Curated annotation (Swiss-Prot):
DNA-binding region per UniProt: 22-41
Protein source organism: Bacillus phage phi105 (Bacteriophage phi-105)
InterPro entries in the cross-refs: Cro/C1-type_HTH, Lambda_DNA-bd_dom_sf
Alphabetized UniProt keyword annotations: DNA-binding
Domain of life: Viruses
Lineage: Viruses, Duplodnaviria, Heunggongvirae, Uroviricota, Caudoviricetes
Protein name (Swiss-Prot/TrEMBL): ImmF control region 10 kDa protein
DNA-binding found in the keyword field: yes
Gene3D superfamilies the UniProt entry points to: lambda repressor-like DNA-binding domains (1.10.260.40)
Coiled-coil segments: none
Length: 90
């Protein structure tokens, strides 16, 4: 299961290494700064597509996610109450 807090912290650390402000990164990704903040703080999990775009922008090796025991769920949603990922029904 994807640990939103670990993933968010990893994204935030890599963003800071690149000396990017949240507003700059959010604009480059075509998302709001508040949504990026929610991702970095573990409140929301990005979709696989969004995570891939983030990884490209900040040079994040997606294999690092496996090493930190973070597993990505394809196009899943995030249940804030349960703090878990869930698959969307087709």
């Amino acid at each position: 299961m994807l640990d939103g807090k670990k993933l968010g912290a990893l994204i935030k650390d890599k963003r800071k290494e690149k000396h990017l402000k949240q507003t700059e990164m959010a604009k480059a990704l075509g998302m709001s700064r508040t949504y990026l903040s929610d991702i970095e703080n573990g409140r929301y999990l990005p979709s696989t597509k969004t995570l891939s775009r983030i990884a490209i922008l900040i040079n994040l090796d997606l294999n690092v996610l496996k090493m930190t025991e973070i597993q990505v769920v394809e196009e899943g949603g995030y249940d804030r109450a349960a703090g878990t990922c869930r698959r969307q029904a087709l």
